[in-house]
Structures are given as C-alpha cells and as structure tokens.
Amino acid sequence: MSTDSESKRRAYREEKEGARKKSVKLAPEATPESKPDLPRKRYYRQRAHSNPFSDHSLDYPRNPDAMEWGKLYPEYANTDKKVEIADIGCGYGGLMIGLAKEYPQTMILGMEIRVQVTQYVEDRIIALREKHEKDEVNYQNIAVLRGNAMKFLPNFFHRGQLKKMFFCFPDPHFKQRKHKARIITTTLLSEYAYVLREEGVLYTITDVEDLHIWMVKHLDDHPLFERLDKEWEKNDKCVSIMYGSTEEGQKVARNKGSKFVACFRRVANPEE
C-alpha cells in the first residue's frame, strides 16, 4: 500500500472514530444526518489473497473457553450465546451482512487473514451498528476477527458449536504444488466436521470450476459429509444470500461469469 493511501486510510479512521465518540456524547440529540458513513474500500487496499502458511502475527485463544466474545459482541457479553455461523475467509463482509438480516438473533463470525480487509470489515460493522442502532436488525450479532482458520479453528470453537460454515470464493491456488494450501482438504475437513454439529451445513461457492470439482470430490470422499441435492439448494435461503451478497460474487456477476455451488450436511459420527 502506498504511503499516500495509508495516510488517507488512517485519517479516515481517525475522523470516523472522532465522529463515533461525539455521537456517543450527543446520543440523546442525535439526528439521522449525524449517523456515520460506511467506510470506503479504496483506503483498505490489499492483495486478493494471503499465504496461509506464512508466519502471520495473529492473536488466538488457548482454547474456546479462553475466547472473550464479549469484546466482539458487546450486546451479548452477559449471555450464554455462542457463535453458530462462521464465514471462513469473509472478505469484505457482504455475506455476514446478508445473513444478519435473516438471522438477527444468531451470532455470526467472519474470519479473515488479511489485515486491511479485516480493518475494513471492523469499521463497516461499527458504522452499521451505529446507523441502525434502533432498528430491529442492528448488526450487533455480526463480528470479524483476523485469524487463520487453517491453523487455529479449534482454538475458537467447541466441538459441534457451529450450525453453518461458509467458504465463498476461496483462493483457487491453481498450481498443483499449491493445492495443499486450498481451504478444502481431507485434513481440514476433519477439523470442520469437529466444530460443525450433526445436521449442520457446509456451504461452498466458487467461480472456478476446477476448484469446485476439487472441493466436491474431497467432501464426497469424507465420511462425515453428505451432499445435499439441487432441490435443497434451490429452497435454502442461505444459498440465495450466498449467491448474491458477497462482493466477489457480485464481481463475477458483473463479468457474466459462472458460479458453482455445493452444500454438504454434517452426518453423524460412525458408531464405534
């Protein structure tokens, strides 16, 4: 990122932080015109993908019980509610925002490894929460954290905690020697099966047919996942949201590209 872009982004964040503090002090007299604007992507530029095997400086809990969710979901800080929907590699947060309207009482988490993109989503959520503070859908149930799901997913979630997991337009890693870095592999699927409850659903969507075939094959071959048919996909509201709400999906649509969807149910563990 250029120094000029970085300084503009920093100035933008400082301006919005000042506006947020001012709005808190003047809350009783706040007007619709004083509501914060959504952040602008051009101040948060970053590469399209990040190497998951790099030694990123990441914070993660020792175990799920050590995770302080109240910092991300202040409205639920004194409740027993837990995250039940995870968007792995959430990008700019479009899917979470779409899901928040459909599941306003369900805690939804986006995990994103890229620094600038995570900061953008953080600011976007803050702005949405303040803009819709008194609305039925107030976006208090969505949050984002910077994390590497390929390494630390079990540090965040208990066994069987999640009911839905989304993998939207993941890095295709075209070169064969890079396939080990794909987000869907046999080893990783076992971890996803661990945090996904029985009858939970794993959703995938991509515009790369070769990657779609790869993901379907690995999920088909895994004993704890069973593919849901096209009729189920047609009637599932989350598929519709996933198909049209992500920024990458909208880009594919503008370019008249294809989208390949596959959804799998988490089946019961085999009897020992």
Swiss-Prot record:
<keyword id="KW-0819">tRNA processing</keyword>
<keyword id="KW-0949">S-adenosyl-L-methionine</keyword>
<keyword id="KW-0808">Transferase</keyword>
<feature type="binding site">
    <location>
        <position position="168"/>
    </location>
    <ligand>
        <name>S-adenosyl-L-methionine</name>
    </ligand>
</feature>
<comment type="pathway">
    <text>tRNA modification; N(7)-methylguanine-tRNA biosynthesis.</text>
</comment>
<comment type="subunit">
    <text>Forms a complex with TRM82.</text>
</comment>
<dbReference type="GO" id="GO:0005634">
    <property type="term" value="C:nucleus"/>
</dbReference>
<keyword id="KW-0539">Nucleus</keyword>
<dbReference type="InterPro" id="IPR003358">
    <property type="entry name" value="tRNA_(Gua-N-7)_MeTrfase_Trmb"/>
</dbReference>
<comment type="similarity">
    <text>Belongs to the class I-like SAM-binding methyltransferase superfamily. TrmB family.</text>
</comment>
<dbReference type="InterPro" id="IPR025763">
    <property type="entry name" value="Trm8_euk"/>
</dbReference>
<feature type="binding site">
    <location>
        <position position="89"/>
    </location>
    <ligand>
        <name>S-adenosyl-L-methionine</name>
    </ligand>
</feature>
<comment type="function">
    <text>Catalyzes the formation of N(7)-methylguanine at position 46 (m7G46) in tRNA.</text>
</comment>
<keyword id="KW-0489">Methyltransferase</keyword>
<keyword id="KW-0694">RNA-binding</keyword>
<dbReference type="GO" id="GO:0008176">
    <property type="term" value="F:tRNA (guanine(46)-N7)-methyltransferase activity"/>
</dbReference>
<dbReference type="Pfam" id="PF02390">
    <property type="entry name" value="Methyltransf_4"/>
</dbReference>
<feature type="compositionally biased region" description="Basic and acidic residues">
    <location>
        <begin position="1"/>
        <end position="20"/>
    </location>
</feature>
<dbReference type="GO" id="GO:0000049">
    <property type="term" value="F:tRNA binding"/>
</dbReference>
<feature type="binding site">
    <location>
        <begin position="148"/>
        <end position="149"/>
    </location>
    <ligand>
        <name>S-adenosyl-L-methionine</name>
    </ligand>
</feature>
<feature type="active site">
    <location>
        <position position="171"/>
    </location>
</feature>
<feature type="binding site">
    <location>
        <begin position="246"/>
        <end position="248"/>
    </location>
    <ligand>
        <name>S-adenosyl-L-methionine</name>
    </ligand>
</feature>
<protein>
    <recommendedName>
        <fullName>tRNA (guanine-N(7)-)-methyltransferase</fullName>
        <ecNumber>2.1.1.33</ecNumber>
    </recommendedName>
</protein>
<feature type="region of interest" description="Disordered">
    <location>
        <begin position="1"/>
        <end position="43"/>
    </location>
</feature>
<keyword id="KW-0820">tRNA-binding</keyword>
<dbReference type="GO" id="GO:0106143">
    <property type="term" value="C:tRNA (m7G46) methyltransferase complex"/>
</dbReference>
<feature type="binding site">
    <location>
        <begin position="112"/>
        <end position="113"/>
    </location>
    <ligand>
        <name>S-adenosyl-L-methionine</name>
    </ligand>
</feature>
<dbReference type="InterPro" id="IPR029063">
    <property type="entry name" value="SAM-dependent_MTases_sf"/>
</dbReference>
